UniProtKB/Swiss-Prot annotation:
Record-given protein name: Uncharacterized protein MW2407
Compartments in which it is found: Cell membrane
This protein's record includes keyword Transport: no
Organism: Staphylococcus aureus (strain MW2)
Gene Ontology CC annotation, any one: plasma membrane
Amino acid sequence: MMHSKKLTLGICLVLLIILIVGYVIMTKANGQNAQIKDTFNQTLKLYPTKNLDDFYDKEGFRDQEFKKGDKGTWIVNSGMNIQLKGGALKSREMVLYINRNTRKTKGYFIVGEITKDKKGYTHDKDKKYPVKMEHNKIIPTKPIKDEKLKKEIENFKFFVQYGNFKDFKDYKNGDISYNPNVPSYSAKYQLSNDDYNIQQLRKRYDIPTKKAPELLLKGDGDLKGSSIGSKDLEFTFVQNKRENIYFTDSVEFTPSEDTSYESN
């Protein structure tokens, strides 16, 4: 009888320990998920910034990577990528380097195409058109004979100019993950076609599918903040071996001397 009581007590103790450990792990995971979501939310607060000139006066996260006196450079990038069944992956994107020191902005409009030959080798072809930005207007810096392309460049709008994540904290059922070894983190949400941002994308791009996309937020670097890390967002409408349709966007704040445009 005494042995039976001890056995029962032992089992109860083990179960209690399992419950406590499980609770601690769950609490830690929930706290980490909330921190990841809050980290993304800090970046998403920039949406919308309708006038790109406003970035000259916007301060970003600063750390020891910034030299004394460097006001930093904002890098904004938006692009639509479409691969129809069995075809090439075609992309049209723009990147701007908004230098807060010089209060000048330069960048590129990039037309890309990725194909595979019969042997399975990948071929990447890009055509860059240099641009500058003045008074919130995109201006090609070299002559462009194709009038349609010229208008496309001049009328280009970055997602940060019209996207809006005011309800991001209310997003539910997200698949949130964290890899401490990199470190990297991500959050994925299934959206509907009624979502404001999706309606805006469909208004501006000819998206050849009615499927509602997933929103994937990706980040790397210290969760508490780092000028070395990056944060990107991606709306994935279709993703498989033969067909891909997705929109990418990023807004980063970096030391001015680290920007790829400045070093070219």
